[in-house]
Amino acid sequence: MDDMQQLKIIIEKHSDGYVAYPVGINGVIVGQGDTYEQALTDVQSAIRFHLDTFGRDSLTVEEPVMEAFVAEASV
C-alpha cells in the first residue's frame, strides 16, 4: 500500500479466540486468530486483499470515524 491510510480496528476477545474488523468501512472485512496479534495481522491481510481486489476507492469512507466506544445497555 503506497498511500497508507490509518484505520480504526475493533478487536474482540471471545472464548475461542479473537475477532478483528475495521470501523466505518462498507463491506465485510474480518480477521481472526488465537491471539490479539494474530487477529490484527489477519485483518490487515484481509484489508490488503480487499484493496488489491476492489481498489482503494472501496475503502473510501464518507465520514471518517473520529472515535469508537464500547458501551453496555439494558434492553
PLM feature spans:
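A short, exposed loop/beta-hairpin motif centered on an aromatic-Gly-Thr core
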Residues: 27-37
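Glycine-centered flexibility motif
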Residues: 17, 31-33, 55
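Intrinsically disordered, low-complexity N-terminal regions enriched in serine/proline/glycine
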Residues: 17-20, 35, 68
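Short, charged, surface-exposed hinge/linker loops at domain edges
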Residues: 1-8, 37, 41-75
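Intrinsic disorder/low-complexity segments, especially N-terminal tails and targeting/processing regions
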Residues: 12, 30-32, 63
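Short aromatic-glycine-(Arg/Gly/Cys) micro-motifs in beta-strand/loop hairpins
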Residues: 11-27
